[in-house]
From Swiss-Prot:
Record's bilayer topology term: Multi-pass membrane protein
UniProt subcellular location: Membrane
Disulfide pattern: none
Keywords assigned: Lipid metabolism, Lipoprotein, Membrane, Palmitate, Signal, Sphingolipid metabolism, Transferase, Transmembrane, Transmembrane helix
Catalysed reaction, written as an equation: N-(2-hydroxy-fatty acyl)-dihydroceramide + a 1,2-diacyl-sn-glycero-3-phospho-(1D-myo-inositol) = inositol-1-phospho-N-(2-hydroxy-fatty acyl)-dihydroceramide + a 1,2-diacyl-sn-glycerol
Primary residence: membrane
Species of origin: Bacteroides thetaiotaomicron (strain ATCC 29148 / DSM 2079 / JCM 5827 / CCUG 10774 / NCTC 10582 / VPI-5482 / E50)
Organism phylogeny: Bacteria, Pseudomonadati, Bacteroidota, Bacteroidia, Bacteroidales
GO molecular function terms attached to this record: inositol phosphorylceramide synthase activity
Signal peptide: 1-23
Cited function: Catalyzes the addition of a phosphorylinositol group onto dihydroceramide to form phosphoinositol dihydroceramide (PI-DHC), an essential step in sphingolipid biosynthesis.
Name of protein: Phosphoinositol dihydroceramide synthase
Superkingdom of origin organism: Bacteria
Length: 305
């Protein structure tokens, strides 16, 4: 059983989480499910308690994303629609029937069923694969590498979320469907990924993007960032060559899909890649060189190892 201090800490934090969530954005069934699952893991026994604590970076990531509903980024800074579109066209524009268009506009008109299928498969990997990779590291007892990966994953997300507030930006599908005037409370849009749903007669992407917390959060593309982090730690962790090759293919596929499906400009993708590399470098060569943070990391590792 956990100590009295641990028990009290977890119960108080969980109660605060549920109360704040209910007050600020409203409780949903997944909040209660997540809280119940965490408490079961924490109190079931020592192995599951270690897992519950190890998963905290991913839990904080999910909570942080959800809580962005409290204060939409467009209430902090103006939304960029035309500026990003025009910059994309000037840097990466392509000619289509004598007209200069963005790559996303080109693919909105020119698309292929095979590409739509692969696009859907790649985009379904962008969160599950990094999380499954982290769990593999954890259960293979490579917990120091796991913890570094999990904390960098969280750190990259926090950098990306900060970017959303610094420069709110509309995705390509918004400019295509709505023009250049920001319309607040615009619902999420499945964009080109809807073709995957249509091919298979499902609503996978419609259910995901219909509940998007904020559509004006295209810069940087965190879709482009996650597999970069996974690939970096697959290399650091000396994973087998076929794992590294698979991660490389998935990473490149997600980058291409982001553009092909009109969810991100090339600029967004490049900034997402930069965000991932910046987060990794700052964590490994900045934070880990600070004694206080290193001590925190070591205590965390000792708890979950």
């Amino acid at each position: 059983m956990p100590s009295k201090k641990e028990t009290l800490t977890v119960i108080v934090i969980m109660a605060l989480f549920l109360l704040l969530t209910a007050a600020c954005i409203g409780l949903r069934s997944e909040h209660l499910l997540m809280a119940a699952l965490y408490l079961v893991l924490f109190f079931a026994g020592l192995p599951t308690r270690k897992l519950a604590v190890a998963l905290l970076p991913f839990a904080i990531f999910g909570i942080s994303y959800d809580w962005m509903r409290i204060c939409p980024n467009y209430e902090v800074n103006p939304i960029d629609v035309a500026g990003l579109y025009n910059l994309e066209k000037s840097l990466f524009g392509v000619m289509d029937n004598g007209v200069l268009v963005t790559p996303c506009e080109y693919f909105a008109v020119h698309h292929w069923a095979v590409a739509d299928v692969f696009a859907g498969i790649f985009y379904l990997c962008w969160v599950p694969v990094p999380i499954l990779f982290g769990l593999c590291l954890y259960f293979k007892k490579e917990r120091k590498t796991y913890l570094r990966f999990a904390l960098v994953f969280l750190f990259v997300n926090l950098i990306g979320f900060a970017g959303y507030y610094i420069h709110p930006a509309a995705p390509p599908w918004y400019a295509i469907n709505y023009g250049f005037e920001p319309i607040l409370n615009t619902p999420g849009n499945v964009a080109g990924l809807g073709r995957f749903d249509e091919i298979f007669g499902v609503t996978i992407f419609d259910s995901i993007y219909g509940r998007n917390a904020n559509v004006f959060a295209a810069v940087p593309s965190l879709h482009a960032a996650y597999m970069v982090v996974a690939l970096v730690y697959a290399i650091i962790g000396k994973c087998r060559w076929y794992v590294i090759a698979l991660f490389s293919v998935i990473m490149a596929g997600i980058w291409g899909t982001a553009i092909y499906s009109c969810h991100h400009y090339i600029i967004d993708v490049l900034l997402g890649i930069s965000c991932a590399l910046l987060g990794w470098l700052f964590f490994e060569y900045g934070l880990m060189k600070i004694r206080g943070f290193r001590n925190f990391f070591d205590r965390y590792y000792q708890y979950i190892k």
